[in-house]
């Protein structure tokens, strides 16, 4: 929840653009009426509840900090950067996956599917694309070989343009540093990914 600077007649709820904003707006359209009804039961009556999708993860954090957003669904990385202007109201869980290994080859043995187990974390996956270089890395991994710093420097990386995105930016940064002693600035070839939903399309 963001700053207390608000019009009591309206509640503004923001989502980060983790996928196509139009898809998020369509999926969350019923949320306004649901919130209005449930909040009224708790004594919070709003004339209008507005659902918005930010232009970036950071834009949602800034909206919370400035008070133009009253509630935001944000990842932990965004919260860390904007915690002075926001308080945690709820934390979410999600369905886990049937693969939960630190060995990347394990993920390639069978399709990844949801399980019924609720988890409070999620993983970031480094996906090798269909290009010759991408498939060479995938073959090396599936053969049980370890990648080298030269391996990862000699390919083009797709990274989230949202620098507070855990899966798209923060976790890959940590992985590169811990495994190869590299930072993102050490990668000579990088392209910005729009969001999670279009990332694989861009990779292809």
Go through each PLM region and give its residues.
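A conserved helix-loop-strand patch within extracytoplasmic ligand-binding domains
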Residues: 94-165
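Short helices/loops that flank or line small-molecule/ion binding pockets
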Residues: 52-72, 80-86, 195-204
């Amino acid at each position: 929840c963001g700053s207390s600077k608000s019009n009591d007649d309206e509640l503004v709820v923001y989502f980060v653009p983790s996928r196509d904003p139009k898809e998020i707006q369509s999926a969350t359209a019923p949320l306004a009426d649901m919130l209005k009804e449930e909040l009224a039961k708790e004594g919070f009556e709003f004339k209008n509840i507005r659902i918005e999708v930010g232009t970036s993860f950071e834009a949602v954090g800034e909206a919370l900090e400035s008070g133009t957003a009253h509630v935001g669904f944000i990842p932990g990385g965004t919260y860390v950067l904007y915690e002075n202007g926001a308080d945690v109201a709820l934390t979410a869980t999600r369905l886990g996956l049937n693969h939960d290994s630190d060995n990347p080859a394990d993920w390639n043995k069978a399709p990844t599917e949801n399980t019924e187990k609720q988890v409070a974390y999620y993983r970031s996956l480094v996906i090798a694309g269909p290009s010759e270089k991408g498939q060479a890395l995938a073959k090396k991994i599936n053969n049980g070989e370890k990648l080298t710093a030269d391996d990862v420097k000699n390919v083009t990386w797709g990274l989230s343009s949202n620098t507070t995105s855990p899966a798209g930016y923060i976790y890959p940064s940590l992985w590169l540093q811990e495994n190869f002693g590299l930072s993102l600035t050490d990668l000579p070839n990088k392209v910005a990914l729009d969001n999670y939903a279009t990332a694989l399309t861009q990779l292809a």
